[in-house]
């Protein structure tokens, strides 16, 4: 019987393998929180997408747009830190979607 140490942590956008009732799923998580208690783990995700619900072309386009925004922001002193963080979050969400679809990204 597995027991976990207590933990509450923020989740960044990423690909996550979730096992529930003996079934394993690969899911693109758009950020959120995870609470670990001795007997269970609870994930409160901003968004969660299964591979069959991900549009690859849309994810690739979002990835490219976010990369372009980040590169242009780095060369522009006018851009605010929040704009850069938003672009980085969009890039991470797109990357998670592509990884869940088994498409390699940088």
Model-derived features with residue positions:
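Compact, glycine-rich, soluble single-domain proteins
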Residues: 1-60, 65-67
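Acidic/glycine-rich phosphate/pyrophosphate-binding loops and surrounding catalytic core
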Residues: 49-106
């Amino acid at each position: 019987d597995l027991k976990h140490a207590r933990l509450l942590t923020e989740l960044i956008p990423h690909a996550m393998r979730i096992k529930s009732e003996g079934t394993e799923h690969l899911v693109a998580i758009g950020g959120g929180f995870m609470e670990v208690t001795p007997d269970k783990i609870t994930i409160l995700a901003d968004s969660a997408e299964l591979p069959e619900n991900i549009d690859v072309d849309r994810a690739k386009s979002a990835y490219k747009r976010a990369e372009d925004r980040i590169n242009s922001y780095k060369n522009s002193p006018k851009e605010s830190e929040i704009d850069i963080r938003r672009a980085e979050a969009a890039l991470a969400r797109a990357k998670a979607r592509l990884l869940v679809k088994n498409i390699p990204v940088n």
